[in-house]
């Protein structure tokens, strides 16, 4: 008898909102040469095919730094750099063009696979390459001639868009052509950044050896603003890691965000399925550089009632929260503050003011189970306290049966029922016997 796979069913259901959001979006994938020669690249190709199948418009920009270095070393040519940029003379460039051409054909071949009993079965991806990047020479700097090293001058947005409209995957190498008929060796990070910005892509996805940017404890930082990412970049440069994959990709991600790309992701090319988990789960796996946070604390609206009910119902059934009907929520929705993450309400609290006493009750405090070990509760208390201050409230109080110590740790002190506003004393449930705690907020 065939067995049911609940984990597969759960994964499909959880990913559905992201499938809908990403359909028709444009993603630029930036993949360095290290990723191309890693054993997991075959799995990444399968994941790229899946994204294509889901209706996502893809541009893949690849690099060839390690392959170039290896080929030059075999030829007995020592790589020359100036200000972290390769100096590409005639002899070196002839080899680099061969390397990039070979990689382009190899990637195209892998994306063209369609063997039965493989993830690529029936994929039929149309891969298009061309002169989509116009380059110009870097010229001479401090007396050093960069020769065939160049920079991006222009991206053929119309040409790329035309191919994406035909459901083709656009493959771009780090070699650009110029109006004079020459070609130049480019930084793949610069190419990917310019393509993402000029195309007004929805995402730039970078592949690194690490699972995002790591904190001091070795954990991936989930989200960074460009300013925070710049601080980490300075730390990497001070540690002598300015040429590391993480540093190179951080520069591209920061510039992309500031150029208008909403989100740039940094994921590992070593971990199977890292890109899919980053794109189709709420918390992802790597690091995203964002212009605006995927999570925000805000005032609730009538559209949030369903999400609030989903959040508080389990706590009501456990007796932790007092039961509220949908009708009551509709009447009191303007009193609620919520924390929303990618469309899911993960926290809520209500504020009931007693203006005569300059006191307010923070009630219906709830945090989604997946986020209770984070600082979301503190964010919620701070947001509600801030709202209370604006209304002229001097003292915030809570009634709780289970979370006494949690509130004590955050500066709330015990209060007698008799010290509550008179109107609230009349509503006190003596059978429930909730503990009362309060905190001065001004």
Curated annotation (Swiss-Prot):
Its EC number is 2.3.1.1. GO terms for molecular function: L-glutamate N-acetyltransferase activity. GO terms for cellular component: cytoplasm. The keyword Amino-acid biosynthesis applies. InterPro entries: AceGlu_kinase-like_sf, Acyl_CoA_acyltransferase, Asp/Glu/Uridylate_kinase, GNAT_dom, NAGS_kin, NH2A_AcTrfase. Belongs to the acetyltransferase family. ArgA subfamily. This is Amino-acid acetyltransferase. Gene3D superfamilies: 3.40.630.30, Acetylglutamate kinase-like. It catalyses: L-glutamate + acetyl-CoA = N-acetyl-L-glutamate + CoA + H(+). The keyword Chloroplast does not apply. Its main location: cytoplasm. Pathway: Amino-acid biosynthesis; L-arginine biosynthesis; N(2)-acetyl-L-ornithine from L-glutamate: step 1/4. In bacteria which possess the bifunctional enzyme ornithine acetyltransferase/N-acetylglutamate synthase (ArgJ), ArgA fulfills an anaplerotic role. It is found in: Cytoplasm. PROSITE patterns: GNAT. Residues 295-442 form the N-acetyltransferase domain. The gene is argA. Coiled coil: none annotated. It comes from Aeromonas hydrophila subsp. hydrophila (strain ATCC 7966 / DSM 30187 / BCRC 13018 / CCUG 14551 / JCM 1027 / KCTC 2358 / NCIMB 9240 / NCTC 8049). Signal peptide: none annotated. Keywords: Acyltransferase, Amino-acid biosynthesis, Arginine biosynthesis, Cytoplasm, Transferase.
